[in-house]
Amino acid sequence: MSVVLFDLDGTLVDTAQDLGLALNMQLTRHGKSPLPHERIWPVASHGTRGLLELGFAVYPDDSQFEAMRLEYLDLYESVYTQHPLFLPGIAALLAALDSKGIKWGIVTNKPRRFSVNLTKAVKLGDSNLFERAACLLCGDDAPQPKPAPDTLLMACAQMQCQAEQCIYVGDAQRDVQAGRAAGMKTVVALFGYLAETDRPHEWGADALIQTPAALLENLSCCD
């Protein structure tokens, strides 16, 4: 494999603290009690939809969903660069990929309005995640975000590679679905935002890894 593509939240970067902070600000605004971090962590990878379902039991087909979604995004915009950190072992993994000459990029469902500044806020050596990644594709860069393969295929076009040369690493079922639909090998990051009810062994990925370092061991398995 010559290219590794990563999901962002819960795969490369721990953003759960700021996602949860915005949700708790919204809950407080609506007279509800804030939620503890351990309740928020497992759904942090599911974006605004998952967070609103957790906090308010509001779903996309509810009449108030869109207003709640926009309110949440405005609150998140005020806090989203406060606490982002690499998940343990990720900085070392990216350095190892660089040393091996393996190109890597980011494909996320996070809107571009957040993704660019977030990746710029996460330092990697003497630069930052945004500068070091070979590409950054966001959920609103294509008509359909993951689990559709559109943004993954756009990443291939930007990096001038074929999908079969790529591994896509993520922590959600939609990541596996998108990668497989694009014709890529897929790896589940078990260290990410998985809930107890998730069953990653049933998602059809080519490999599951407990730590970022294990990805290096699995590169040959995905050839």
Predicted feature descriptions by range:
Residues 2-92, 99-100, 113-116:
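N-terminal helical cap/lid subdomain that shapes the substrate entry/recognition surface
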Residues 26, 72-76, 80, 105, ...:
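Hydrophobic, well-ordered secondary-structure segments
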Residues 33, 103, 185:
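Residue-level detector of anion-binding/catalytic polar loops
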Residues 5, 12, 104-107, 168-169, ...:
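Conserved SAM-binding loop
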Residues 1-2, 111-223:
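Asp-based, Mg2+/Mn2+-dependent phosphohydrolase catalytic module
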Residues 8-11, 104, 133-140:
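Surface-exposed, interaction-prone regions with an acidic/low-complexity signature
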Residues 96-103, 160-163:
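Short, surface-exposed connector motifs at secondary-structure boundaries
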